[in-house]
């Protein structure tokens, strides 16, 4: 992490120096629990927390100074900067640091696949370049500016993930990051409590086009493509089903990944082994290949970036336990991602299929209908056993025609699963982040005891 300079922070934020001791800081932190010696502590205030209550804790752990909104603060011998709004100050600092950079910035947004696509892009560029990338899925109005504030200054490319919950969110992030390249993975039904409609989801994701010069979009998502028609910059398409600039051909899916021919514009087809299962991960890979090719990355680096990739935790992880094949896709869920996961379950099935499915949260007035439709489709697909987790899935469970169980929470669902699964089963575990579906496996006694750990 590069050093932060006091005078630059004041210039960026318009803040007032209440006391001056240290003029350089080892980095920026908003968490008093993890702050490191010499870092600048920025006290954020949220709905359930106020960083100003932990100023003393931050200093006790070696913070080199503080940015806060208090009229005064009694911390003698420390650098104190007062601002009117600490969140805006965080944005201002990140915007200022971004403005000092001339390296290309690639931003990734969309309903599904953002994190995996971002990591695949970073893996490709990382074969020969220093990459700054969003940590995990810290893709919001706090995580993204913190990522930018962590620049060393010698990065050669930035790969930033942008998430949204309401209209205008992507615009806020783009105003900070100023992306040169935009990747939009798809548009689907998610966070409808904030958006209200899928049209608003698309409108919000495509706010990114007001900033980027080049857009890379999924040609298999016709609804997304319709929204890009008026874009005045360069559009690169990728896809499997439809004509696109970047395509995958001769796809050979396997249990632990897929092989396919990668077709890039004007280049010879190259064979790829992607160590990620699922058709949607091929689309994520095509997005990464498209943007890398546009940036002049060699095909050999694209191939190496894919084949050295090791996946993203809690996203379509394949595990085996006592003859049971487990698909753990527990990070999040919405109707489109659930359908894709079920498709993968059916492809990998051996004998019985078991779906442990938690509520899909934040769907607003569409929630009841969405849950019922998913359950009906599972019945039509011939799923053998359904364990419904949470009130929404439980309410929709009446639509299921196979063997059905209900559970209040993920841990209870795991107890049910441990009673009914048997050798040869293929099990899918999925649900929204708030359902904490990773706890399903914690309830299996052998796992809890550490026997043959998954």
Where are the regions that the model predicts?
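Acidic, Mg2+-coordinating active-site environments of NTP-dependent enzymes
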Residues: 8, 12, 68-77, 183-325, ...
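Mobile, glycine- and charge-enriched loop segments
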Residues: 34-41, 149-157, 180-182, 342-364
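Phosphate-binding loop of NTP-binding sites
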Residues: 8-10, 89-215, 219, 225-234, ...
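Short beta-strands and strand-loop turn motifs
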Residues: 103-109, 183-188, 218, 285, ...
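ATP-dependent carboxylate/acyl-activation modules
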Residues: 108, 313-315, 434-440
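N-terminal leader/targeting and accessory segments in enzymes
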Residues: 1-92, 247, 277, 347-348, ...
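Active-site beta-alpha connecting loops in nucleotide-dependent enzymes
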Residues: 46-48, 312, 330-406, 432, ...
């Amino acid at each position: 992490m590069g050093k932060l300079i006091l005078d630059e922070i004041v210039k960026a934020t318009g803040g007032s120096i209440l006391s001056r001791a240290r003029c350089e800081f080892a980095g920026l932190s908003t968490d008093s629990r993890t702050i490191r010696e010499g870092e600048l502590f920025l006290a954020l205030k949220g709905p359930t927390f106020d960083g100003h209550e932990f100023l003393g804790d931050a200093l006790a752990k070696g913070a080199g100074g503080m940015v806060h909104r208090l009229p005064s603060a009694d911390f003698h011998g420390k650098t104190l900067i007062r601002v009117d709004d600490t969140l805006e100050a965080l944005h201002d600092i990140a915007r200022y640091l971004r403005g000092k950079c001339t390296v290309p910035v690639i931003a990734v947004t969309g309903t599904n696949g953002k994190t995996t696509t971002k990591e695949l892009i970073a893996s490709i560029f990382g074969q020969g370049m220093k990459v700054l990338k969003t940590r995990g899925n810290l893709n919001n109005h706090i995580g993204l500016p913190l990522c930018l504030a962590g620049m060393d200054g010698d990065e050669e490319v930035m790969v930033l993930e942008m998430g949204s919950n309401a209209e205008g969110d992507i615009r806020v992030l783009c105003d900070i990051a100023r992306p040169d390249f935009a990747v939009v993975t798809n548009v689907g039904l998610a966070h409808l409590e904030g958006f209200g409609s899928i049209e608003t989801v698309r409108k919000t994701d495509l706010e990114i086009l007001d900033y980027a010069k080049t857009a890379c979009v999924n040609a298999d998502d016709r609804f997304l493509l319709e929204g890009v028609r008026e874009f005045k910059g360069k559009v690169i398409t990728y896809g499997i089903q439809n004509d696109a600039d970047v395509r995958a051909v001769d796809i050979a899916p396997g249990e632990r990944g897929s092989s396919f021919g990668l077709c890039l514009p004007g280049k010879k087809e190259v064979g790829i082994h992607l160590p990620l299962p699922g058709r949607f991960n091929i689309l994520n890979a095509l997005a990464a290949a498209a943007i890398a090719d546009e940036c002049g990355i060699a095909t050999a680096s694209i191939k190496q970036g894919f084949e050295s990739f090791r996946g993203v935790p809690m996203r379509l992880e394949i595990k085996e336990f006592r003859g049971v094949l487990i698909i753990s896709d527990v990070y999040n869920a919405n109707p489109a991602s659930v359908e894709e996961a079920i498709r993968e379950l059916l492809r990998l099935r051996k004998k019985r299929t078991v779906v442990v499915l938690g509520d899909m949260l934040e769907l607003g007035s569409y929630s009841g209908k969405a849950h019922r439709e998913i359950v009906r489709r599972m019945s039509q697909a011939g799923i053998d056993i359904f364990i419904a987790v949470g009130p929404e899935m439980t309410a929709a469970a009446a639509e299921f025609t196979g063997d059905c169980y209900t559970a209040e929470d993920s841990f209870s669902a795991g107890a049910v699963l441990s009673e009914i699964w048997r050798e040869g089963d293929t099990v899918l575990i999925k649900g929204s982040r708030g359902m904490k579906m990773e706890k399903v496996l914690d309830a299996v006694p052998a796992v809890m005891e550490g026997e043959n750990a998954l």
